[in-house]
Swiss-Prot record:
Family stated for the protein in its record: Belongs to the PRA-PH family.
Domain of life assignment: Bacteria
EC nos: 3.6.1.31
Entry annotated with the keyword Metal-binding: no
Subcellular location: Cytoplasm
Molecular function per GO: ATP binding; phosphoribosyl-ATP diphosphatase activity
Name of the coding gene: hisE
Assigned keywords, A-Z: Amino-acid biosynthesis, ATP-binding, Cytoplasm, Histidine biosynthesis, Hydrolase, Nucleotide-binding
Pathways involved: Amino-acid biosynthesis; L-histidine biosynthesis; L-histidine from 5-phospho-alpha-D-ribose 1-diphosphate: step 2/9
Protein name: Phosphoribosyl-ATP pyrophosphatase
Predominant place of localization: cytoplasm
Keyword ATP-binding belongs to the record: yes
GO biological-process terms attached to the record: L-histidine biosynthetic process
Known catalytic reactions: 1-(5-phospho-beta-D-ribosyl)-ATP + H2O = 1-(5-phospho-beta-D-ribosyl)-5'-AMP + diphosphate + H(+)
Length: 132
């Protein structure tokens, strides 16, 4: 078996392990804001960690654009890792886990992006009509 063959399960395991660490760093679970970056962000509340998600998303965009001008691909990977990490903090705060995101991606598998977007628009219209 090659590394490519085992990449997905290892990635999911790594995400699950990281999610466990983040969960353990929640102040409610004994995470100390003076000793843990995750605990500090969670202690400060959603504004703090959501600001970081926004900053990291912007850095992903900038790193991707830099690739068009010869930048190293590793920079994009680094920034996406930061975005995923901070997004996982947000997920944990709201009682969610990477498995929830993976389940949603699996749900979308085989559905074209155009079709999926049309289904969301139809559902939104239906909700608006039912609520009016």
């Amino acid at each position: 078996m090659t590394r490519t063959d085992t990449h997905a399960p290892l990635s999911q395991d790594a995400l699950a392990r990281l999610a466990g660490v983040i969960e353990s760093r929640k102040p409610a679970n004994g995470g100390d804001p003076d000793k843990s970056y995750v605990a500090r962000l969670l202690h400060k509340g959603p504004d703090a960690f959501l600001k970081k998600v926004g900053e990291e998303a912007t850095e992903v965009v900038m790193a991707a654009k830099d690739l068009d001008h010869g930048a190293d691909k590793a920079k994009l990977v680094y920034e996406v890792a930061d975005l995923w990490f901070h997004s996982m903090i947000a997920l944990a705060h709201y009682g969610l886990a990477p498995a929830d995101v993976i389940a949603e991606l699996e749900r979308r598998e085989g559905i074209s992006g155009i079709e999926e977007k049309a289904l969301r628009k139809a559902a939104a219209r239906s909700s608006e009509e039912g609520g009016a």
